[in-house]
From Swiss-Prot:
Binding site for [2Fe-2S] cluster: 94, 100, 103, 140
Boundaries of every 2Fe-2S ferredoxin-type domain copy: 57-159
The organism of origin for this protein: Drosophila melanogaster
Cofactor: how bound: Binds 1 [2Fe-2S] cluster.
Entry keyword set: 2Fe-2S, Electron transport, Iron, Iron-sulfur, Lipid metabolism, Metal-binding, Mitochondrion, Steroid metabolism, Steroidogenesis, Transit peptide, Transport
Transferase in keyword set: no
Gene (name only): Fdx1
GO cellular component: mitochondrial matrix; mitochondrion
UniProt record similarity statement: Belongs to the adrenodoxin/putidaredoxin family.
Protein name: Adrenodoxin-like protein 1, mitochondrial
Gene Ontology BP annotations: [2Fe-2S] cluster assembly; electron transport chain; P450-containing electron transport chain; positive regulation of ecdysteroid biosynthetic process; steroid biosynthetic process; ubiquinone biosynthetic process
Subcellular location: Mitochondrion matrix
Length: 172
């Protein structure tokens, strides 16, 4: 098998063959060689099952109609992507890049102190969220740990960007 090394010319918008080599294992290849990877969806970690019972964290989502959905997550799961895995209607339009408030949730007061303190960027976004409460957080910024066992997350009645043109949120 051969490995072709190409250099792209910015001037002529073309590629020039630099050398032809026998392919070597990935850790021996030059830095400018082309590598490809398998595409991954956002929240890939959340789509994996817990490896042991020690990792399991049980939480409950309460949707805008009051329907309660108990979910079994694991330590390190992102609350937004975990909701997507279990078909809970939490949009997450910016895909956890801290650019919207569509994953806005209300955290039970008992569990608020167990969460990491919100960073300034999250607080700034929450200021723009409709139906803001003192226990409001962005779901994309909450990572589960064992201290959150039994936590309840309530979804607000509406968020900005939600159901635009009849859109129903789906995992990305």
């Amino acid at each position: 098998m051969f490995c072709l090394l190409l250099r792209r010319s910015a001037v002529h918008n073309s590629c020039k063959l630099i050398s032809k080599q026998i392919a070597k294992p990935a850790f021996y290849t030059p830095h400018n060689a082309l590598h490809t990877t398998i595409p991954r969806r956002h929240g890939e970690f959340e789509w994996q099952d817990p490896k042991s019972t020690d990792e399991i964290v049980n939480i409950t989502y309460v949707d805008k109609d009051g329907k309660r959905t108990k979910v079994q997550g694991k330590v390190g799961d992102n609350v937004l992507y975990l909701a997507h895995r279990h078909g809970i209607e939490m949009e997450g339009a910016c895909e956890a890049s801290l650019a919207c408030t569509t994953c806005h949730v209300y955290v039970q007061h008992d569990y608020l102190q167990k969460l990491k303190e919100a960073e300034e960027q999250e607080d700034d976004l929450l200021d723009m969220a409709p139906f803001l409460r003192e226990n409001s957080r962005l779901g994309c910024q909450i990572l589960l740990d064992k201290s959150m066992e039994g936590m309840e997350l309530e979804l607000p009645k509406a968020t900005r960007n939600f159901y635009v043109d009849g859109h129903k949120p789906k995992p990305h």
